[in-house]
Amino acid sequence: MLNTDKIYFYPYKIFEVERRKYLYTIYASGLFEIDNTVSKLLQLNGSTVESIKEALKIDLTEDKSIELLTDMENEKLLCRNEVSHDESQEIEKANFSALTLMLAQECNMRCSYCYGEGGEYNNKGIMTENVAFQAIDYLVKNSTDELLHIAFLGGEPLLNFPLLKKVVEYCKQISADTGKKFSYTITTNGTLITDNIEKYLTENKIVCQISLDGTKEKNDMNRFFRNKKGSYDVIVEKTKSMRHMNLVTARATVTPDNSDYKEIFNHLNELEFRAIPIAIAQNMVDDEQFDKILSEYINYIFYFEELILTKQYAKAKKMTDLVNALEKIEFGNVRNNGCGAGRTMFA
C-alpha cells in the first residue's frame, strides 16, 4: 500500500446497540464492531494513505495504521484509488446447475397482481416433450456438478402434469447412465392438486411451494379464478394432507391492501406450512404505499427478534426471507450479480 494511494470506503451504515457501535458494509454484507479509531478513519474518505497515517498517529503507529487499512481492504470495506464495482467484477464461465422449465404458459386463475399476463406471458401454450428434453440435455452437457436441479414453473405447471412426469422419468434415465442426481421443485397455485398428483410429488421428492396470501378475506381479494371466485377454500382443502405432513411451503404476496406481514405469517403458520417466504407485488405499490409496507416489514423484523428471544426457534425458522438475510451477513461476501441467471441457472 503506497503513501500516495487514495482510500475510498464502500457504502456502509453505522448503528449502536447497548452502547456498542457496529458497521454494516453493504457491498460485502459484512457486520463489524468498530471503535473510535475506525470511526475517525471513516471520516477520511478520499484521503491518501500518508494523510491517514498522520491523522491517526495519536491512536496508532504507522505500521498499525497500514495493518488496519489492509484488514479493511481484505474485508471489502474499502478500496484504493476509487476502483469501480464494474472494474472489480470478474466474468465467470457459466457452469449450470439448475434449470427452470415453464411447463405451461397458461393459468386457471387470474390474480390481480400477476406479472405474466394471466400466466401466458403474451405467448400462450404448453411446453412440448422435445423442448423439455433438449433443455435437460443442455443442462447436463454444460454442468460439471453431480447434483442438478429442475424447477417446474408456469403459468400453472400442473396444467401440463403429464410432461412433468415424463421429465422426471427422463432424468431418472440420465441418472442411471451418468451417475448425476436430480432434485426438483414446483411452484403452483395448488388448486389442481389431486390425490394422484400429491402421491407422485411426494414419492419423487418434488418440493412443493404454493401461493397463498394469508387469511381467506385477504387472499381472495387478489387470488381468484377467471369467474372472480376466491381460491382460498380450494387451496386449503387441496393441500391439507401435504401440510399435515410438513411437505409444502406457502409463498405469500404483500400488496397495499394486504401488508400486515405478522398477520400473514401467523395465519399461514397456523395452517402448518413448513416455510413461509413473503414478497412484495412491486407492480402494485407506489412510493407512499411502499413507506407503509416498509413500516409493516420493520414490525415483522421485530417480531422475528421476539421469537428468537423467547426461544421459539422452529417458528422463527419459517421466516425464510429473514433467515436468508442473516445468513448473507454471517457468511458475508461480495455479490456482483443479483441471481445466477446465465451463470448457474437458465430457463
Sequence positions of predicted segments:
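Radical SAM enzyme [4Fe-4S]-AdoMet core and its adjacent flexible, acidic
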Residues: 222-233, 240, 244-340
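Short, histidine-centered active-site or binding-site loop motifs used for metal coordination
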Residues: 27, 117-120, 152-154, 216, ...
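Acidic, low-complexity/disordered tracts enriched in E/D and polar residues
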Residues: 1-43
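Conserved alpha-helical substructure of the radical SAM core
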Residues: 67, 71, 75-77, 81-199, ...
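Short acidic/His/Gly/Ser-rich catalytic and metal-binding motifs that mark active-site loops
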Residues: 109-113, 216-220, 286-288
